[in-house]
């Protein structure tokens, strides 16, 4: 009966079940499945005898013609640790050296503390950064090209997820530029060496950048000449490249800084637990630091510089492991950076460059105590021993006064109508009562369709979720982003928006501050902000890099506090001013507008260097509040900075009747002290 059971050549009389030999003294050796049923009666016993026995010793046998085994984590280019190498099982070589080939532990194989900026760069070994470049014998040696990584960082030609320059990019040459300070360097007109490093220029070409923008033309020589900088440039004008290009170029030319001598006792398995970055970039939101980090990876490709990013709301363990592998350029939010400093995992003693991006918000909206602690309360070099760079689209006067504490002999750079908007953006203002906003929004979306990306701004987190759900119920593919969402939810929402799977994004202004999202064709201010500077930043999400865009604002009498500034903004950008705005402005002449926060915005000369304006911030100073546009009183803080010994209170109602009234910024939920919660990060 056994002879009849044969299913697909599997028989009970198979050799693996047959007696081993005469007398049935034992069973045959086990036959692996891939050797069963071999034609011609292969000598399976010999094959089985040749098979390696189980256990770790099987992998340690001597090899002929193969490189010596060994692990060198700091040298990814070593032939015995390359993925899918030709020798070894599964294409991988041994993890354990064989007897006779075992080498003594070499601490220098993991990176020498004097040769890698922070951790890596072991005497000629790769730091495994953005492209495995090296700093060896005082020279920068770029790593080999990596086609997969190039596609990830730079995309492919005509990649829809990578925005190219628009039809109006050439108009940037007509933008007015004002640079004030002593001995301002001459601008550059092309990406050339000098002043830039050749390797950086090759990465700029990979990114398909043709010519520098106005802010880059001036910031590159200013930073390369060792000067501090306060730069104002309209949204979408290339500010990120304005500080990354000179910082990375000098890093490629000068090499890493030596780790302090006392750090040598902090090594663990050849690695230091504490990072010693040479450049620090601070920004207010998680999304913005991630965006800057992506740009840093792009331009540090194939170099020895390893960029890292840390921010709140994400797993701190993975961020610690990231900086342990090497950290030369650190992009961070202030809160998470303070946390890592307290944990003893980051030292600022080697900082050569400090960058504050969106600096006006960083200093104004509750981060000032944390920034002062980072800059003045830790081991960061003093203002005279480092370069400090501040970038933003708006720099109101009182924020300039605060910023002077962090700068030395700086150059003030004003590019374009700072605090204004690009003429590439077509601005439309519609009179819409609150109860009609949803129906008008649907009309706009049906009219414009979803061919491009549409960004809708609301004031509250609750409204962001409610409006997103409403649009989904109306069969519009929408998603939302705000401060109460987890970091993973925010990243997923942004990714779906960037890839156009959800071409409509509902966002709070704080969450989307500074984001460079390609191909946003329409920005809708569903809730108009109470601050004209916020309006500038919101609509600046479109019309970037010379591309054109549309910005629509829903206006009603509840927004009359910004009506005068809005009219001035529209006139400056040569946009149509609706008649209802003029009539409401005449009705509300008693309000006078706040001129930005407490009179700091457009009425406060947000694009002028305060050093050239004369006067002090005391009693004889020009009036800032509503006084720029009428209204009683009007002196900022009652003629003194802040109106008292405590932190300044911005406003005092419309017209800025006194600086002592009503604190601004409370609506943003930010702390007055360093330990309070913050909705910014």
Swiss-Prot record:
Motif (Q motif): 189-217
Biased composition (Gly residues): 113-123, 589-604
GO CC annotation terms, alphabetical: cytoplasmic stress granule; spliceosomal complex
Keywords of the record: ATP-binding, Cytoplasm, Helicase, Hydrolase, Initiation factor, Nucleotide-binding, Protein biosynthesis, RNA-binding
Reaction equations catalysed: ATP + H2O = ADP + phosphate + H(+)
SUPFAM superfamilies to which the protein is assigned, alphabetical: P-loop containing nucleoside triphosphate hydrolases
Start and end residues of each stretch annotated as Disordered: 1-144, 586-619, 661-681
Low complexity compositional bias, start-end: 41-50, 669-681
PROSITE patterns according to UniProt: DEAD_ATP_HELICASE (PS00039), HELICASE_ATP_BIND_1 (PS51192), HELICASE_CTER (PS51194), Q_MOTIF (PS51195)
Highest taxon of the lineage: Eukaryota
E.C. number(s) listed in UniProt: 3.6.4.13
Short sequence motif named DEAD box, residue ranges: 357-360
MF term (GO), any: G-quadruplex RNA binding
Residues annotated for ATP binding in this entry: 233-240
Segments of skewed composition (Polar residues): 89-99
Domain Helicase ATP-binding: start-end pairs: 220-413
Subcellular location: Cytoplasm
Cysteine pairs bridged by disulfides in the record: none
UniProt GO BP: cytoplasmic translational initiation; negative regulation of cytoplasmic translational initiation in response to stress; positive regulation of formation of translation preinitiation complex; regulatory ncRNA-mediated gene silencing; spliceosomal complex disassembly
Chain's role: ATP-binding RNA helicase involved in translation initiation. Remodels RNA in response to ADP and ATP concentrations by facilitating disruption, but also formation of RNA duplexes.
Name used for this protein in its record: ATP-dependent RNA helicase ded1
Gene that encodes it: ded1
């Amino acid at each position: 009966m056994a002879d009849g059971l044969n299913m697909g050549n599997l028989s009970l009389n198979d050799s693996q079940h047959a007696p081993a030999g005469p007398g049935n003294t034992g069973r045959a050796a086990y036959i692996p499945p891939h050797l069963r049923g071999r034609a011609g009666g292969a000598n399976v016993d010999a094959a089985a005898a040749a098979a390696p026995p189980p256990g770790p010793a099987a992998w340690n046998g001597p090899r002929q013609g193969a490189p010596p085994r060994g692990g060198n984590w700091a040298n990814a280019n070593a032939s015995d640790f390359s993925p899918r190498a030709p020798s070894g099982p599964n294409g991988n070589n041994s993890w354990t050296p064989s007897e006779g080939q075992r080498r003594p532990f070499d601490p220098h194989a993991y990176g020498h503390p004097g040769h890698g900026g922070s951790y890596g760069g072991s005497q000629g070994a790769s730091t495994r950064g953005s492209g495995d470049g090296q700093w060896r014998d005082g020279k920068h040696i770029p790593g080999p090209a990596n086609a997969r990584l190039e596609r990830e960082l730079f995309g492919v030609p005509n990649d829809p997820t990578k925005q190219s320059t628009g039809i109006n990019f050439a108009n940037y040459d007509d933008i007015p530029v004002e640079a004030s300070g002593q001995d301002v360097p001459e601008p550059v007109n092309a990406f050339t060496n000098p002043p830039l490093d050749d390797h950086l220029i090759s990465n700029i070409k990979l990114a398909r950048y043709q010519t520098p923008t106005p802010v880059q033309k001036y910031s590159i020589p200013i930073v390369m000449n060792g000067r501090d900088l306060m730069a104002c440039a309209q949204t979408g004008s290339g500010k990120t490249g304005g500080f990354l290009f000179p910082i990375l170029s000098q890093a490629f030319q000068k090499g890493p800084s030596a780790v302090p001598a006392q750090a040598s006792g902090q090594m663990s398995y050849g690695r230091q637990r504490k990072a010693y970055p040479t450049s620090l970039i601070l920004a207010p939101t998680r999304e913005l630091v991630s965006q800057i980090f992506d740009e840093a990876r792009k331009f540090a490709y194939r170099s020895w510089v390893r960029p890292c990013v840390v921010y709140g709301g994400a797993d701190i363990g993975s961020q610690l492991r990231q900086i342990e592998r090497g950290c030369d350029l650190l992009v961070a939010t202030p809160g998470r950076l303070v946390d890592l400093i307290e944990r003893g995992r980051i030292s600022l003693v080697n900082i050569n460059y400090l960058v504050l991006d969106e600096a006006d918000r960083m200093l104004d909206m509750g981060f000032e105590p944390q920034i002062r602690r980072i800059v003045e309360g830790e081991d960061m070099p003093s203002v005279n021993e480092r370069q400090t760079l501040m970038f933003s689209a708006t720099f109101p006067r009182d924020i300039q006064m605060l910023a002077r504490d962090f700068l030395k002999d700086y150059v003030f750079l004003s590019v374009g109508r700072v605090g204004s908007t690009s003429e590439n953006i077509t601005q439309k203002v519609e009179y819409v009562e609150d109860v009609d906003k949803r129906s008008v929004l649907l009309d706009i979306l049906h009219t414009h369709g979803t061919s491009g990306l549409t960004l809708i701004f609301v004031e509250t987190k609750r409204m962001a979720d409610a409006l997103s759900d409403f649009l989904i119920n109306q069969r519009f593919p929408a998603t939302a982003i705000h401060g109460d969402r987890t970091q993973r939810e925010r990243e997923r929402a942004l990714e779906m928006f960037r890839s156009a799977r959800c071409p409509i994004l509902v966002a709070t202004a704080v969450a989307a501050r500074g984001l460079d999202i390609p191909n946003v064709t329409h920005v809708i201010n569903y809730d108009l902000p109470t601050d004209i500077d916020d309006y500038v930043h919101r609509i600046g999400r479109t019309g970037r890099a010379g591309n054109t865009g549309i910005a629509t604002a829903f206006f009603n009498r509840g927004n009359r506090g910004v009506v005068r500034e809005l009219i001035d903004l529209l006139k400056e950008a040569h946009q149509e001013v609706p008649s209802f705005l003029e009539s409401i402005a005449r009705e509300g002449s008693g309000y006078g507008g706040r001129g930005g926060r407490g009179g700091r915005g457009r009425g406060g000369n947000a694009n002028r260097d305060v050093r050239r304006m004369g006067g002090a911030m005391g009693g004889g100073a020009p009036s800032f509040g509503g006084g720029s546009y009428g209204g009683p009183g009007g002196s900022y803080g009652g003629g003194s900075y802040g109106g008292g010994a405590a932190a300044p209170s911005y406003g005092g109602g419309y017209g800025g009747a006194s600086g002592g009234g009503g604190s601004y910024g409370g609506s943003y939920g930010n702390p007055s002290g360093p330990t309070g919660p913050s909705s910014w990060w």
